[in-house]
Amino acid sequence: MYSISFQDDISMMPRERLMREGAEKLSNQELLSIFLRTGNKKETVFQVSQRILSSISSLNDLKYLTLQELQTISGIGPIKAVELQAIIELGRRINRAEVLQKEQIMGSQKLARKMQQELGDMRQECLVAIYLNSQNQILHQQTIFMGTVSRSIAEPREILHYALKHLATSIILVHNHPSGSVVPSRNDDEVTQHMKEACEMMGLVLLDHLIVSKSNYYSYREETDMI
């Protein structure tokens, strides 16, 4: 990892370079420096940016850092940690929208692989609902809950609310198992059955319920006759 010396030439400052040449011309260190704005008593903002980037193996690792982990980095206080997580999440959503917008789902495996990339490394369980039209094109993806997925928090009301809002005809549920095992629990079975019944009452179809880990996935449609 290299370090940039800006010296006193204002034309080389990241903000000025971005305005003159465009954001795509800036290095990761320069972009991060623009966001952080200031350093600390011992380091410039460029040195803080350099140290953050040196502490991770790739930019992708940034999205897995918790607020507490970000604040262990000298120069990153509570406010900057919150701001950094917010901008990372915004980038994640932009990327997800570009990838999933109007994509047609032809099978559970393809969607499972995509969701493995998104949820496979998460340390908490996350329940996501994906809403599709009659051509099985994705209309919307909504995170329903983060924590421990149970029937009590996977109530159909919120899930069905987004289906009606986006005029969906079918739903796919996806959640991750941080343990790495994708074997469904009894609770997973109950959530699946409960949601299937709720969807049928509303004239919707529960197409699948996927359980994903970093390296594997489980499809209720492929593995059971529940769906």
UniProtKB/Swiss-Prot annotation:
SUPFAM superfamilies, A to Z = RuvA domain 2-like (SSF47781)
One GO MF term, please? metal ion binding
Q: Which InterPro entries match?
A: MPN, RadC_JAB, RuvA_2-like, UPF0758, UPF0758_CS, UPF0758_N
Q: Gene3D superfamilies attached here?
A: Cytidine Deaminase, domain 2
Q: Where is the MPN domain?
A: 104-226
List this protein's GO terms for biological process.
proteolysis
Pfam family for this entry, one: UPF0758_N
Location of the motif JAMM motif: 175-188
Keywords linked to the UniProt accession: Hydrolase, Metal-binding, Metalloprotease, Protease, Zinc
Q: Where does Zn(2+) bind?
A: 175, 177, 188
The answer to whether keyword Hydrolase applies is yes
What PANTHER family is this protein classified in? Answer: DNA REPAIR PROTEIN RADC, UPF0758 PROTEIN YEES-RELATED
Regarding protein family, the annotation reads: Belongs to the UPF0758 family.
- State the name under which the record lists this protein: UPF0758 protein SSA_1218
- Which organism's genome codes for this protein? Streptococcus sanguinis (strain SK36)
